[in-house]
Amino acid sequence: KLSMVSFMINRFKNIEIKKVLIILVIILFAFSALFSLSSNDKIAILEIEGVIKNPKQYLESMRDISEDDSIKGLIVRIDSPGGTVGSSQEIHESLIKLSNKMPTVASIVDIGASGGYLIACGTSHIFANSGSITGSIGVISQYYNFSKLIKFLKFDIETIKSGQMKDIGDSSKALTNEEKRLLNSLVKDIHNQFKLSVSKTRGLTDEEINEVSDGRIFSGNQALEMKLIDKIGGLEEAIIYIEGIIQLPNLDLEYFPKKEEKLLDGIIPAIDNSSLLNMLNKKLYYLYSPKF
């Protein structure tokens, strides 16, 4: 009887030991999986550089970032004087949507002006260096008048149009007073759209936005005083800020757009920019464009 009891006790112990071992294995596996996931977490850095004429590569990058569950935050690294109105607005709106999913921060390098600044306003927090150039909240549109040159060269240009305003901005003739009035109205409307976007995202009063929206530029220090940015700092400060929000330190960084995309998209505009037609296209710009 004693041997039977001893056998049962030993068997019970073996069963309990097995259970404990199984539980330990499960716990270790869970911790290993958790550690693996956390070690793969990262911050995306979206680099926006140069004059913005086509938002495609940036929109595609933001879609990739949004669909990647390992990306816990986004830093938009801006070094741009702005660009075309529609492109700047598309990127701005896409960033606002992305900000609802993850923390987003803008980091202005040398310049984040006009459309570049509008893009920064699509994020939840804006950093700039003390000497960065920003602001330039305005609209510009330039039309070339080659009518005197055409007359000198004795060229004849015949235009057949369906309406009085169909050839507005045609470089072969000067703008009429009515055309100037129409274009001024257009610029004013788009300028008001810019002001509304900035005042809404930055929480500015009508008086505050009117004070900074005449097209003037600001240094980072001045922009901080005018509530156009949140803090003075560069990429490191932006990373620390994001990590503080998501409570995950020392995250990996993944840069967008990918290098092959940037190379391809850089070649095509370079070819396009060599064309005389590019100089003559009729577009409105959120662009800081000093004549040096």
Predicted feature locations:
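N-terminal organellar transit peptides
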Residues: L2-A106, D110-S114, T123-N129, Q142-F292
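Short, charged, surface-exposed secondary-structure boundary motifs
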Residues: I137-I140
